[in-house]
Amino acid sequence: ISFSLVMCDDIRSRKDNPDFAVVRAMRPDITALLESRGVPVFNNLKVSEICNDKSKTYAYLSTNNIPVIPWISAEAGESAPPAPFIPCVLKPCGGHGGSGVVLAKNEAEYISLAGSMRSGYVIQRLAEDSSDTRVYVIGKKIVAAVMRRGRGDFRSNFSLGGDVCKRELTDEEKKLIYSVCELFEFGLVGIDIMYYNGHPVINEIEDTVGSRMLYATHKNIDIVSEYLDYIEKSL
């Protein structure tokens, strides 16, 4: 398999279609365009449209009886809805890597932070602790799991200085991940698990998941090679 890097803005002007495309951008419009031309895309449009929007993710999972942390959605520019939970976490629907995620510890902070949001957002109950587990999935296969823990921050993102270590999933966690996999045709994603009321719940599904944590904790896994093997068998 040979590859070439094509920027999103150049896709529309190209006349030739590739045999397949790996879209590493949060651009459902580009994925939709490629699929309309008959190009197999990894990840596909359903994954891109749902998983790059936290409100859509939580709504879709909840509709399919997949547990998530209690949440509501809100629109920027409107009066903030009454705080459903205090403390609570506010997240931009299209945020990535912990960017724009803020914690409101009381009602006054909530009103101030909600008023500062510049795009649609979700309001979520604060999880039991700052750790979560990212599960790397190719297709319907669990590749590996990495625990992340915030360092002086309620956010656990590796890019924000969180500590990471490899871990084994429990049977309950595996069952949860496989239940999510049945709802999608994934290429490569990261599914984030947190705990609520003593049980695992889904926090996010990362469409354009990065692999630095995986490389840091699982030296024996070549995620790119495994992903390419999966793509080749899928075509």
PLM features per residue range, with description:
Residues 30-31, 98, 199:
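Glycine/Thr-rich phosphate-binding loops of Rossmann-like dinucleotide-binding domains
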Residues 38, 46-132, 170-171, 235:
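Active-site nucleotide/adenylate-binding loops and adjacent lid/helix of ATP-dependent enzymes
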Residues 26-28, 47, 142, 148, ...:
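Short glycine-enriched loops at secondary-structure junctions
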Residues 18-20, 88-91, 135-137, 199-213:
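A short beta-strand motif that forms the metal-chelation/ATP-contact edge
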